[in-house]
Regions:
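A conserved beta-strand/loop element that lines the FAD pocket in flavoprotein oxidoreductases
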Residues: 171-177
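Glycine-rich FAD pyrophosphate-binding loop
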Residues: 28-50
């Protein structure tokens, strides 16, 4: 059965929090007021205001929503992060940091990791993380918004405040709760 594309006029999003309001803000920014968008959420089940982590692909969503980064960080008590730390990763009291971005520089012959492995085998490669600008910056606790040679980063933010922020964006685009 084929459905006429103009037969759907109402969209209902069930569930709030960051996921629900993210969906509402995204959909409403794409289709605007051509559709009636309603978000249904419980007043009894609140958003947990704990820290929420993102990854660099999050920027695509923020570009879609035309979010001003400085305002956003202020409103959601956000901080910048350059990677994800995995505590007790291999052994107790050892950690591994997965840095965002590329490690080393590949060339036409092969990927960087091939050269690094050969160097390690021969005894003259440093730790793999030493070749990551993001990891080096994270360990030095340094970050700056650069125009060129930007570091890859993401955010750590308050989930409750982020849900409220997204709700305001969605409601500006005619989403009704």
């Amino acid at each position: 059965m084929q459905v006429e594309k103009d037969t759907v006029k109402k969209i209902v999003i069930v569930g709030g929090g960051t996921a629900g309001w993210m969906a509402a803000a995204s959909i409403s920014s794409l289709i605007g007021k051509d559709f009636e968008i309603t978000l249904v959420e419980s007043d009894e089940i609140g958003t947990v205001g704990v820290g929420e982590a993102t990854i660099p692909t999050f920027f695509a969503l923020h570009q879609l929503l035309k979010i001003d980064e400085a305002e956003f960080l202020s409103k959601v008590q956000g901080t910048i992060k350059l990677g994800i730390s995995f505590e007790n990763w291999h052994k107790l009291n050892e950690s591994y940091i997965h840095a965002f971005g590329h490690t080393g520089k590949s060339c036409w012959a092969a990927g960087f990791h091939h050269f690094w492995l050969k160097g390690k085998e021969c005894g003259y490669s440093d730790d793999y993380g030493c070749y990551s600008a993001e990891l080096s910056a994270a360990k030095a606790e340094k970050f700056g918004f650069l125009k060129q040679n930007k570091l890859n980063y993401a955010y750590h933010l308050n989930a409750g405040l982020y849900a409220k922020y997204l709700r305001k964006l969605a409601e500006k685009n005619y989403v009704v709760r």
